[in-house]
Amino acid sequence: MGDSRDLCPHLDSIGEVTKEDLLLKSKGTCQSCGVTGPNLWACLQVACPYVGCGESFADHSTIHAQAKKHNLTVNLTTFRLWCYACEKEVFLEQRLAAPLLGSSSKFSEQDSPPPSHPLKAVPIAVADEGESESEDDDLKPRGLTGMKNLGNSCYMNAALQALSNCPPLTQFFLECGGLVRTDKKPALCKSYQKLVSEVWHKKRPSYVVPTSLSHGIKLVNPMFRGYAQQDTQEFLRCLMDQLHEELKEPVVATVALTEARDSDSSDTDEKREGDRSPSEDEFLSCDSSSDRGEGDGQGRGGGSSQAETELLIPDEAGRAISEKERMKDRKFSWGQQRTNSEQVDEDADVDTAMAALDDQPAEAQPPSPRSSSPCRTPEPDNDAHLRSSSRPCSPVHHHEGHAKLSSSPPRASPVRMAPSYVLKKAQVLSAGSRRRKEQRYRSVISDIFDGSILSLVQCLTCDRVSTTVETFQDLSLPIPGKEDLAKLHSAIYQNVPAKPGACGDSYAAQGWLAFIVEYIRRFVVSCTPSWFWGPVVTLEDCLAAFFAADELKGDNMYSCERCKKLRNGVKYCKVLRLPEILCIHLKRFRHEVMYSFKINSHVSFPLEGLDLRPFLAKECTSQITTYDLLSVICHHGTAGSGHYIAYCQNVINGQWYEFDDQYVTEVHETVVQNAEGYVLFYRKSSEEAMRERQQVVSLAAMREPSLLRFYVSREWLNKFNTFAEPGPITNQTFLCSHGGIPPHKYHYIDDLVVILPQNVWEHLYNRFGGGPAVNHLYVCSICQVEIEALAKRRRIEIDTFIKLNKAFQAEESPGVIYCISMQWFREWEAFVKGKDNEPPGPIDNSRIAQVKGSGHVQLKQGADYGQISEETWTYLNSLYGGGPEIAIRQSVAQPLGPENLHGEQKIEAETRAV
């Protein structure tokens, strides 16, 4: 990497080229075919003014270089240099670094040889968000692309437009396209990536047809098949769940990885060790127990002042282009589960007085098994407050008895607990999870949208307090009525918890007479100005209603584990971890047994400065608590029919636009404020994050020559460019637990990393912590050995099973038949066939066995089991252990008399201790 042999000897042939010259040429055309940009290439040979097209067209730039023997050329969009003679990307800094490298032979010898393919310093630009796009005035603004209605698909179009205008997600799909890899069908992430690229392309069409994504979502969830109108919130949940499933990656054990890197690192500065933030495996969160299972990066490259720098870090205003033509690489070939996890809760048995409880934040109880909300009682509608358990999140970890929370600024201290109670680890893992290694997953979806809620419930009889941490991806908020508002405001003014049932009782089951009265009242209300009926409902009121304390009494009493009976209780909930983008769903639709209706009440929501500080738990470590509105989805019509549109703020020019299927119209912000919001997307706002990016831009512009360059995760750099709180540097996305590159990632490692100069790396490392520091990439030999050993193990196990099962099938009358649980067998089969990386736990026949009155175990009637031979059972049991052993033994009894000449076949189930 730093070897002088890697230096391009042709850099001296570059003539004097100014930034203004390059910008002027970028507005021109190919001198051979007349095609316009982007991605024109300018020859850098002295006194050569040629500008040619790239591989996207006829590639006249290459033809010119080969004919004229002009070796160096620069991309007029990305300002990256390519040498045809060396067949690699080159950097102007190498001319400055050459004397230093030449005088440091010791360093050159120690440096590792370059990899088999050139690794690129990726141009990701960070510029001032306030800069105008004057250099691209001749181009239409990006992201203003409509979507054709495919037949009652406005619910999908509005949701996609709202997501498309979430910069962290869009920037990921535009700038980190190499990370969008999946072997899972229907590869919805690929369809979404293609759609985002079309919507945000500089030469965008007036509208696109999202056929591929529509077809994919119908394969995932049959509910969306046909042409019936659907709920946009259900579509959002289903889409994001599937994107997470396809993009999820196992979380590497950070502690082991840090130790592995530290053992090889030349920098052991104790100060840096103290500055490191808690790693990602210290997040405190768990799965939601929701029963609802399914539910900008826009590129601008030309105008950066760092046109000749090795590192251009893109900004959230979208001035960096997506890397479709990153370099002219003729040498390199591109060849080569958050599963349905068990619930993991944080429960605590705590004796505390009500007086002490009053001093604590209001936190709530875990939901009942059929509840879709951590803080509300079940309601007969189609809404869910928390995400489905099909999307696990960052798991619960404990170190020395203290639960730690990750924070964005570097900090390593354990979380500050509330004085009246202490969280303790609950033993609620299922039998399978105890026996099988727990695997944790994360994805860009969970990084952006996942938050967590701390729920607390107290028994009013014994004062037992239990806590649960649950992950949410959206908050479904009730819309309080006039009476509810009075109760909420009264509780606020008196500084006491709101009266329980503030928003639940008003929507209780209604009789026919009550229904008619309610229907007439709602019709009259909809025709009467809101000022006539009372105060306007605000989004803060909806949040207060959601987080208000609830009494558990009557039919909703709390089942106390200490009292062993139903008791009256109180439940609270607070936000434990704020998401980068907060999705809020207003519960406008009510679906009762005999009818449905829509709540048309106007809910006032802020465009800027939504503050969630009043709803945070004391343990919350999020430093930024204010949010600005990104987009809002609106529904016009009734509960039975209607139309969806979206209002979104364009990240480039800050203007608001209405997206109505294929029509996009600029609107004033007052139109947005008066809209009847249904789903709202808010983004964390931080001036400090913008200043931090500007500081990194300044450091990159200094172009200080250095002996070392560092590799950083491209995905984390995208977080730095678009997140208000990016968190610690997470190089674990391209490293294994041993500190090397996993063999299966090495062939596309340049898609996973970005090269940073030393001064930029040191600034980011000192500011955010994390890591580990990486300035040498190598394939992990330990992982390679493990992969080979795993493949050998799989081959031996499956070959042995096939051999034993073939012999078993050849037996006409086996003396004994062993039973094995098909659930366990399917897990083992997935492992040996390579569909699952984790081997199954011990054999678990408990699902197919039942105990007789005498204590013996027999096969359960109707059980899901398979029949195997004694030899096969012995072989599998020797590898995995477990049980119980269930054998159906066949024996022929002695004849009882002449009338029974053929004997009697007796079949009994036997159980042996394992």
Swiss-Prot record:
Residues 145-685 form the USP domain. It catalyses: Thiol-dependent hydrolysis of ester, thioester, amide, peptide and isopeptide bonds formed by the C-terminal Gly of ubiquitin (a 76-residue protein attached to proteins as an intracellular targeting signal). GO terms for biological process: antiviral innate immune response; endocytosis; negative regulation of canonical NF-kappaB signal transduction; nervous system development; positive regulation of autophagy; protein deubiquitination; protein K48-linked deubiquitination; protein K63-linked deubiquitination. CDD domains: Peptidase_C19R (cd02674). One of its GO terms (molecular function) is G protein-coupled receptor binding. Ubiquitinated via a VHL-dependent pathway for proteasomal degradation. The active site is at residues 154, 643. Zn(2+) 1 binds at residues 8, 10, 83, 86. The keyword Zinc applies. PROSITE patterns: DUSP, USP_1, USP_2, USP_3, ZF_UBP. InterPro entries: DUSP-like_sf, Papain-like_cys_pep_sf, Pept_C19_DUSP, Peptidase_C19_UCH, Ub_carboxyl-term_hydrolase, USP_CS, USP_dom, Znf_RING/FYVE/PHD. Belongs to the peptidase C19 family. USP20/USP33 subfamily. This is Ubiquitin carboxyl-terminal hydrolase 20.
